[in-house]
């Protein structure tokens, strides 16, 4: 088995554990803190719900890619999808954490059947356009890491953040601007 596929599996496992530990360490008061100002003003629980819904969607897209499809539909409005999906999810912090762990386990099971050559299969992403299946898998752990950084930044500043990449990269991703 190739080094890249092993690396991706390890990062998915390790970053999944870090994400779960991060959310487990939060107090109940923290769970009600608003993190983003855009859209519905996601709170901590909404961010974890977003991880769950996004990863579930990626699992469908990844399977589609393996079957010769392109992944995410070209016309997917990612912001609308995220808002709609998060709005349908509810649960206690413990329930959301358990669901997150199960979804990550499902992703790890998916990777168990991959071959090295699968990583280069062409794939579409609604925000990043044409990529490859391996890139999608890496995005699963990078995505969560970026949001955890946002949560820490919001906690440190004591204020919610705009949902942009400006505080990280200088690139504004807010669809309203």
Feature-to-residue mapping (PLM):
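An N-terminal domain-cap segment
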Residues: 13, 17, 21-25, 29-36
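Structural signal for well-ordered, non-membrane alpha-helices
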Residues: 16-24, 55-59, 63, 101-115, ...
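Surface-exposed helix-capping loop/turn segments at secondary-structure junctions
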Residues: 25-31, 112-120, 156-160
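Acidic/histidine-rich alpha-helical segments that form the ligand environment
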Residues: 80-121, 135-138
